């Protein structure tokens, strides 16, 4: 805890390096995982570095605010190069999901008349393909190398809990999902706690994968590892952790 001269108390986090308090951000090494200063960004809303990949849905069903705005991987690289993160003392950049999302609009179960694009990245169709609206494999490798040259980590937000309903994986394996309906006939959507915590769907168009089953868990851990084996990511932020069973985490870290 820290206290002011007038007796006000608050908790404060002090980064340490070899037992010594770090007072300058540049003294924090990117290998000191417990001392990182993170910057979380949503790629589409961060910076547009390559207008050639801009692709709005331009649908009358979608408000402009929930359509694609043009942010991309090249935009992150540009901000690394111009010192944006360094000036803030950032040592780790956490980026939103980069995998391919749908090309059309989808509504929410609670209000199907309100439709959204997948600008956020949390509706994966392909788990090992960079969404072309965000960039290319080469642009991703360039961004990661640029961050590492600047002594910064990059962690990837990865979605293992669900796939978009249009995913070829789900079309080939429709039985890989949990049940949409509960025994009492209610839809198992948004049932976040209790017995349904590991089976509930976020919405009808993003079915939850039943990763309690080995034949489902194995390919989902393989696709997570794809990004660190084929690209130089420094780690993950896993989406919807509380809704994914323990066996997935054991398999991933085995």
Annotate the PLM regions.
Residues 1-31:
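Extended acidic/polar, glycine-enriched regions
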Residues 25-53:
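Compositionally biased low-complexity segments at domain edges in trafficked proteins
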Residues 46-231, 249-254:
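Substrate-binding/active-site clefts of carbohydrate-active enzymes
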Residues 155, 235-241:
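Short catalytic-loop micro-motif centered on adjacent basic/acidic residues
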């Amino acid at each position: 805890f820290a206290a002011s001269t007038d007796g006000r108390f608050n908790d404060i986090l002090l980064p340490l390096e070899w037992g010594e308090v770090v007072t300058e951000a540049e003294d924090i090494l990117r290998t000191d995982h417990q001392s990182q200063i993170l910057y979380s960004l949503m790629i589409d809303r961060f910076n547009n570095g390559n207008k050639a990949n801009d692709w709005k849905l331009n649908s009358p069903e979608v408000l402009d605010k929930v359509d694609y705005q043009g942010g991309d991987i090249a935009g992150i690289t540009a901000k690394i190069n111009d010192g944006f993160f360094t000036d803030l003392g950032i040592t780790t950049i956490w980026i939103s999901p980069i995998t391919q999302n749908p090309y059309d609009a989808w509504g929410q179960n609670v209000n199907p008349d309100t439709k959204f694009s997948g600008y956020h990245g949390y509706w994966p169709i392909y788990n090992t393909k960079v969404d072309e609206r965000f960039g290319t494999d080469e642009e991703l490798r360039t961004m990661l190398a640029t961050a590492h040259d600047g002594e910064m980590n990059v962690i990837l937000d990865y979605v293992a809990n669900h796939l978009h309903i249009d995913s070829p994986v789900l079309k080939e394996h429709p039985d890989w999902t949990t049940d949409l309906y509960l025994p009492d006939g209610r839809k198992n959507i948004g049932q976040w706690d209790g017995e349904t915590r590991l089976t509930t769907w976020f919405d009808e168009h993003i079915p939850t994968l039943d990763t309690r089953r080995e034949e489902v868990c194995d390919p989902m851990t393989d696709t997570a590892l794809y990004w660190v084996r084929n690209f130089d990511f420094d780690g993950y932020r896993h989406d919807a952790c509380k809704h994914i069973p323990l066996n997935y985490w054991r398999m991933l870290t085995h």
